[in-house]
């Protein structure tokens, strides 16, 4: 992982919080670095029981780390549920993949 990201995470964990708020922590990372970061947070959650609140656009990371997901579009909640539910919700698919057009 890039050193700056490691430092940011270490600084946040120094006080041994019960809740870790991560805001776009995957931004600017390559896919392999994102995978490393996901593994770090999964391990951290399992070993310490820390709650992680993730604000993120990298959906692969969101789906991998989350037990519960809330999806916002222009500040409005459009869906909420498990990653499995979110990945199949027509409202989410329409917002992020575009609506099907009649051909």
What are these regions (language model features)?
Residues 1-103:
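Glycine-rich phosphate-binding loops of nucleotide-dependent enzymes
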């Amino acid at each position: 992982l890039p050193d700056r990201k490691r430092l940011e995470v270490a600084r946040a964990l120094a006080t041994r919080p019960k809740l870790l708020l991560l805001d776009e922590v995957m931004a600017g990372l390559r896919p392999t670095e994102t995978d490393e970061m996901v593994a770090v947070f999964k391990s951290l959650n399992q070993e310490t029981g820390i709650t992680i609140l993730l604000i993120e656009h990298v959906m692969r990371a969101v789906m991998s780390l989350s037990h519960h997901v809330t999806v916002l579009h222009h500040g409005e909640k459009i869906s909420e549920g498990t990653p499995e539910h979110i990945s199949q919700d027509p409202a989410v698919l329409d917002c992020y993949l575009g609506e099907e057009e009649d051909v």
